[in-house]
Amino acid sequence: MDQLTLTNPVFVTYTIAASIMVLKVMLQGWITVVRMMSNSAGFVSPEDSKAGPANPKPRPGQLDLNDDVDRSRRIHRNDLENIPAFLAIGLLFVLINPPLVAAQWLLYGFVAARLLHTLAYSTAQR
């Protein structure tokens, strides 16, 4: 298991890529909440539309779909479908001791693809 040490540049590459992806998943959930609060719409649960500190002025329709909120929610779901598999497969990839350049291309390539996917999807690109 010498591959799973910070002296292994392939493992360092993996830890950087994995850290960015975990932060992205965590941040996307909060982005959805911010969009929900700023639009005062797109709430999921009936209790979300009741008066309270997070919803001082309830109004009809807060439980209706809101494209801005729902788009962010779909990005988050897509992250939750793809990033855990990347974390597992990436770690297995480190264990086979691949060439550093190949690891950098594949691992950082995945990170770039996920970030570009988020940008394209959040701005409704096709």
What are these regions (language model features)?
Residues 52-79:
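Short membrane-interface loop/juxtamembrane segments of multi-pass integral membrane proteins
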Residues 108-124:
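Transmembrane alpha-helical segments of integral membrane proteins
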Residues 28, 33, 96-97, 101, ...:
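Membrane-embedded alpha-helical bundles that constitute the cytochrome b-like, heme-associated redox core
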